[in-house]
């Protein structure tokens, strides 16, 4: 297949390129980038007035298959990703059964391989998330695991984490960690602040996150292994990551769009759709997170796409599951709350959604270059619209429904094929 993208604003953070150019794609590769390109029998995509960027990469999604396909399937998750401009995603291990064995992982990846986007997966750190017994890292890597995480459940035993990091270092594998100490938490999913107190319960204080993060960062420093901090939410957590990096620890960190966009007050408006682990925090926390994004302390923006059904969410705040979908609003929230407000340039935003996620797992992705992969997103960076009530995801649990955002994905191209086109 030959595809010719004409007159788009090519923004490639890896090469610091930002100029109007044409891109010629043949099969799964970019073969030419230049001005006034033409070729016979090519399908033309008119990108005039639009941004052409590397396909987005999300290193933190929950596609719920196997075992919870009433919430999401790999297929519906892949469709949601493509609609959001993502050409590659990494699934977490908290399926049913958990991705703890080569058999379950292999079967899951065989399903994922049928989709139009690239889907990878991590294996669990501990067997069935028991927090005690490590999985067989070597066998899981052979089965296709690109890293390890017990995301959704923190590793409370420091000794287990240390053993996991020591083992991961032998294969240069990435360990990704959910940082919330359950011993310091009352009710999960709600900040221990004004909202929780008005609701009459104790929530999840910021110390439950940054205290565990400090412990784990120092263990990573001691072992020399690579540790990735998932979905940090507290201002103090940014300081911990900054300190650990300055010390020389091989630490990377991610933040979700919701944690730099809205506060715990959103629970009063959106109810359980704004209940998340870790919870939404304060305006002060958002300010420190934005500073961490600006100075490079926070490396990656990831969605933590976590679908639930309406029935599951339509219960009391203390009983509802935590999580929200995010693949179809991620780029827009970055454009709206970071770029439009002058916190990041467009290239800086894209770095945290393409180049840096690719670095975590050594993907050949996240850049636009001749002979490089034909994975791209084409979007209108300035178009305002209201987030709808339906999504390509099977789920609708988003606190951003009816919110006005900036930016709209027009095309997603993966391996040289148009896998999403706006209607």
From Swiss-Prot:
Q: Which cofactor does it need?
A: Zn(2+)
GO BP terms: namely: 'de novo' UMP biosynthetic process; purine nucleobase catabolic process
| Active site positions | 304
Q: Please write the reaction equations for the catalytic activity of this protein.
A: (S)-dihydroorotate + H2O = N-carbamoyl-L-aspartate + H(+)
Q: Where does substrate bind?
A: 62-64, 94, 277, 308
Keywords in alphabetical order, please.
Hydrolase, Metal-binding, Pyrimidine biosynthesis, Zinc
Going by the record, the broad EC class of this enzyme is hydrolase
- The EC code for this enzyme is 3.5.2.3
Listed CDD domains:
DHOase_IIa
- Which residues are the signal sequence here? none
Q: Which residues bind Zn(2+) 1?
A: 60, 62, 151, 304
Kindly list the positions annotated as binding Zn(2+) 2: 151, 178, 231
A GO term from the CC aspect: cytoplasm
Q: Sum up the protein's function in the record's words.
A: Catalyzes the reversible cyclization of carbamoyl aspartate to dihydroorotate.
- Tell me which family the UniProt entry assigns to this protein: Belongs to the metallo-dependent hydrolases superfamily. DHOase family. Class I DHOase subfamily.
**Name of this protein:** Dihydroorotase
